[in-house]
């Protein structure tokens, strides 16, 4: 089934705390945003341990997020440049350091969350109805992304697990506050971490970031 792409881009540089109307995108700008999103989603090594977000403004794409795979940062910039209407790409993606300790922590956290009976339906091939996709858009609006304000997130996995020097950050979108709470608890139960930041957004509600 083809990906259903919903465009919810805010060009404001500040987050949801600022008041004011969201500028409307022209048809050609919307087309460019869709192409950028498609290029990033098709990156072969973009997965659950990475997180990408972007903004588009008058031909300039700004990329942010975290890259676990060694070539993802370069591939994301190259992919964004292929989209129509893109004149310049500013690549601010942070490359995560190579660390066996972090790798072990990533996989322990992955299994703790995606194999949990309460959360396993979010895993690829889990209990969701065929064709159901937790895509970023709609309830997970660009203006609501606390870590990257004004950026449009991209991803297939609903819960992305970022590990950096032993610190775990959960990014993504879930259905309910209970799902967010359980995901944070499971991550906190993983031995060896130096802290957990639960930045999951509950679809359709105002996000709350909690440090556990």
Predicted regions and their residues:
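N-terminal targeting leaders
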Residues: 2-12, 16-212
């Amino acid at each position: 089934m083809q990906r259903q792409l919903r465009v919810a881009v805010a060009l404001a540089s500040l987050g949801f705390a600022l008041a004011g109307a969201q500028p409307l995108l022209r048809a050609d700008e919307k087309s460019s945003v869709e192409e950028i999103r498609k290029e990033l989603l098709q990156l072969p090594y973009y997965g659950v341990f990475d997180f990408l977000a972007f903004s588009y403004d008058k031909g300039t794409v700004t990329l942010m997020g975290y890259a676990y795979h060694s070539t993802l940062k370069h591939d994301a910039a190259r992919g964004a440049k292929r989209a129509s209407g893109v004149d310049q790409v500013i690549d601010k993606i942070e490359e995560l350091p190579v660390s066996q300790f972090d790798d072990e922590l990533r996989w322990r956290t992955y299994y703790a969350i995606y194999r949990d009976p309460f959360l396993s339906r979010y895993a690829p091939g889990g209990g969701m109805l065929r064709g159901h996709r937790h895509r970023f858009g709609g309830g997970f609006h660009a203006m609501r992304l606390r870590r990257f304000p004004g950026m449009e997130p991209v991803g297939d996995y609903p819960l992305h697990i970022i590990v950096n020097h032993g610190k775990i950050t959960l990014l993504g979108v879930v259905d309910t506050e209970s799902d967010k709470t359980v995901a944070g608890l499971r991550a906190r139960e993983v031995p060896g971490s130096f802290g957990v930041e639960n930045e999951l957004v509950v679809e359709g509600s105002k996000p709350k970031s909690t440090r556990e």
